[in-house]
């Protein structure tokens, strides 16, 4: 039976999930997880405590409990359960208070809540990335923080959205299609913003697999076409001196991190 895991918070539980996933990913086993956000009252906390205790009774093993609870009364209820507690906030806040010489002022929903200017900036970035996805329009390229380039299905859209959602970066993206291959060049709107261009590439065999699942046995998905497009686009990157990374076998988080590392774009944390 897979070990049971609870991610609990009086907010969104995103912090608890991220912390827990980072720790548990070090172990080569599967976990059965349950996320419980917005545990904002003692009544809710007692119900969660019962769930944890029932899990212990059913499995005979203490479940792992990762939590980021601001309210100390609610936190104490979770402490009193039969779970193995991993308290993200208290583990680090107390030593930091001593080091900084000031007392923390916990505020509910501060980490991932709606925070006026910063929240609006993130929403603006997300809207921008959606409106400027896949070359839908070239009107707003001058306002982009970064413009991702690449062949179809190489990871442009998820990378753009991740950059906007996670870091508040206005990321547009532009595709090069099979019709472009005979005379591959940058459109004028991209030439004007050459300093913002960043290329994505991918192994042709992997691209072939992805496209086959979308349009099987078509010219678009053929290995020959995939090899041609990747070769032509990579040659253009080198010719135009556009930095690029290979997305093959990399998660969207890894791709975004590589992009930020190469470009030096500022991360807007929320």
From Swiss-Prot:
The keyword Kinase applies. Keywords: Kinase, Nucleotide-binding, Serine/threonine-protein kinase, Transferase. Coiled coil: none annotated. Its EC number is 2.7.11.33, 2.7.4.28. It holds the Pfam family Kinase-PPPase. It catalyses: [pyruvate, water dikinase] + ADP = [pyruvate, water dikinase]-phosphate + AMP + H(+); [pyruvate, water dikinase]-phosphate + phosphate + H(+) = [pyruvate, water dikinase] + diphosphate. Signal peptide: none annotated. It comes from the Bacteria. It is an enzyme of class 2 (transferase). One of its GO terms (molecular function) is protein serine/threonine kinase activity. ADP binds at residues 150-157. The keyword Kinase applies. Belongs to the pyruvate, phosphate/water dikinase regulatory protein family. PSRP subfamily. Bifunctional serine/threonine kinase and phosphorylase involved in the regulation of the phosphoenolpyruvate synthase (PEPS) by catalyzing its phosphorylation/dephosphorylation. This is Putative phosphoenolpyruvate synthase regulatory protein. It comes from Shewanella denitrificans (strain OS217 / ATCC BAA-1090 / DSM 15013).
